[in-house]
Swiss-Prot record:
The modification N-acetylglycine is found at G2. Homodimer. Interacts with many nuclear hormone receptors and cofactors including AR, ESR1, ESR2, MC2R, NR3C1, NRIP1, PPARBP and THRA. Interacts with ABL1 (phosphorylated form); the interaction retains it in the cytoplasm. Weakly interacts with CDKN1B. Interacts with ARHGEF28 and CDK16. Interacts with KCNK18 in a phosphorylation-dependent manner. Interacts with SAMSN1. Interacts with the 'Ser-241' phosphorylated form of PDPK1. Interacts with the 'Thr-369' phosphorylated form of DAPK2. Interacts with PI4KB, TBC1D22A and TBC1D22B. Interacts with SLITRK1. Interacts with MEFV. It comes from Mus musculus. Keywords: Acetylation, Cytoplasm, Phosphoprotein. One of its GO terms (biological process) is cytoskeleton organization. It is found in: Cytoplasm. This is 14-3-3 protein eta. Adapter protein implicated in the regulation of a large spectrum of both general and specialized signaling pathways. Binds to a large number of partners, usually by recognition of a phosphoserine or phosphothreonine motif. Binding generally results in the modulation of the activity of the binding partner. Negatively regulates the kinase activity of PDPK1. GO terms for cellular component: cerebellar granule cell to Purkinje cell synapse; cytoplasm; cytosol; glutamatergic synapse; intercalated disc; mitochondrion; plasma membrane; presynapse. The record marks R57, R132 as: Interaction with phosphoserine on interacting protein. The modification Phosphoserine is found at S25, S59. Phosphorylated on Ser-59 by protein kinase C delta type catalytic subunit in a sphingosine-dependent fashion. Its main location: cytoplasm. Belongs to the 14-3-3 family.
């Protein structure tokens, strides 16, 4: 059994044990062998890092909320400790994101040929996602540059997906979902977010008969998430409009 197969086996085992740091480390090593990733390999890489970064994002949100409360309480001593801990989590999160972005630029996006539309969109979406995660914790000039990089990656992926993929394709739908979240949460542009999500949902509904049996479950799940977000976002906007005259 070659190195590559051993690493993949370790990644699958780590996934079953829910040891995502180990899983990410194995998939990073697989990627650095600089051979094309199969769909399964690609998904292993994505799942590993999504869980690794997800744990840090969740911790960061909890600590940020404690920091806000501590600030309001005026407890300076505690605030210093909380702030230092938030910064520690931030550094971990940034390291994970930068690892993924380096793999994408050095190997994955770079090695896609002109006809590997699905892989290209998958990796560009991933690039948009990890710059978005950096944007969640960044501020000032640093935030501006990661926001721009995130939008550029999403836009490039979006153009390729519109030209070469069915509206019901789960990767195209997943991209629309995350790109619309980027507009809503990072750019604070609810109208643009709703427009993008609604267009993606409507386009998919219009071509439901093209739904691939293999991806039916994935596609319909993402369509449901798009619809849930639209419901939430439009009710938020209505609440704001209703409250504007108060």
């Amino acid at each position: 059994m070659g190195d590559r197969e051993q690493l993949l086996q370790r990644a699958r085992l780590a996934e079953q044990a829910e040891r995502y740091d180990d899983m990410a480390s194995a998939m990073k090593a697989v990627t650095e062998l600089n051979e094309p990733l199969s769909n399964e390999d690609r998904n292993l890489l994505s799942v590993a890092y999504k869980n690794v970064v997800g744990a840090r994002r969740s911790s960061w949100r909890v600590i940020s909320s404690i920091e806000q409360k501590t600030m309001a309480d005026g407890n300076e001593k505690k605030l210093e400790k909380v702030k230092a801990y938030r910064e520690k989590i931030e550094k971990e999160l940034e390291t994970v994101c930068n690892d993924v972005l380096a793999l994408l630029d050095k190997f994955l996006i770079k090695n896609c040929n002109d006809f590997q539309y699905e892989s290209k969109v998958f990796y560009l979406k991933m690039k948009g996602d990890y710059y978005r995660y950096l944007a969640e914790v960044a501020s000032g000039e640093k935030k501006n540059s990661v926001v721009e990089a995130s939008e550029a990656a999403y836009k490039e992926a979006f153009e390729i997906s519109k030209e070469h993929m069915q509206p019901t394709h789960p990767i195209r739908l997943g991209l629309a979902l995350n790109f619309s979240v980027f507009y809503y949460e990072i750019q604070n542009a609810p109208e643009q977010a709703c427009l993008l999500a609604k267009q993606a949902f409507d386009d998919a509904i219009a071509e439901l008969d093209t739904l691939n049996e293999d991806s039916y479950k994935d596609s319909t799940l993402i369509m449901q998430l798009l619809r849930d977000n639209l419901t939430l976002w439009t009710s938020d906007q209505q609440d704001e409009e209703a409250g504007e005259g108060n």
